[in-house]
Amino acid sequence: SLGQPGLLLVLADMEEAFDHGRPGVGQLLLELVDRPVTSLDLLERRFRPRLIYERSEGGGRRLEGLPERKGPARGAGSPREEIETDGVRFAVDVEAGPKTGFFLDQRRNRGIVRGLAEGKTVLDGFCAAGGFGLYALAGGAKCVLAIDASRPAVETARANAALNGVSGRWEGEAEDLFQALRNLRDVGRRFDLVILDPPSFARSREGREGALRGYRDINRMGLSVLTPGGLLATSSCTQLIDVAKWKEALRD
């Protein structure tokens, strides 16, 4: 984030994407772009990307009354790229995919999951592009069931499984994860490793209590489909919920 809350820059091979959603950041970028020597100039000199793509959009900007902007900020070419992280390959679309195209912030945690996955049956909940599940398979997981409410996300994850040659050990379902976990529990399907990487559960302060209930519910349901001695890997990206409150919800 370069020390600026609300500003995210992601470099993937020779393509750079950025998005911002907080008040003041848009003006900061306008000032940067208008200066003779800008931060974008410095990024070009340092990384020489073929394309810098802006995605400043979403509910946060609308709440603040900020205009949305989406498109090339510098350079030209296709906003689609194939990347490799830790030997795992992903097709990335910074134009149509989530935020900046791929969530690189969970790379370290994916590596931890990879080290725990050998021989395990895995549930990749809120799978997005399939990152956690594919790292698990790279670490020797027996099989992965990936679930996301977004059908395009599941299809992207399916394509990424094919890209890595692991389609035979990967299956995906486009379904609300809360309901999917109930169904799995009721039919007795269990997993050695359950991964829960949910989207933000609160967009405003008024939504914090509902978000905490959501974390309690989803993690209880995740535990309900674990084998005895199984592992639950869970996370939060809800900015309005601090770590102490989140851990308290998990203990509940």
What is each PLM-predicted segment?
Residues 5-8, 12-13, 19-37:
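N-terminal targeting segments
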Residues 22, 38-102:
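Non-catalytic substrate-recognition/targeting regions of SAM-dependent transferases
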Residues 120-126:
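Conserved class I S-adenosyl-L-methionine
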Residues 129-141:
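Conserved SAM-binding loop of SAM-dependent methyltransferases across substrates and taxa
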Residues 143-148:
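Conserved SAM-binding motif I beta-strand of class I
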Residues 155-189:
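S-adenosyl-L-methionine
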Residues 191-221:
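Mobile active-site "lid"/loop adjacent to the S-adenosyl-L-methionine
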Residues 220-252:
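C-terminal substrate-binding/active-site "lid" region of AdoMet-derived donor-dependent transferases
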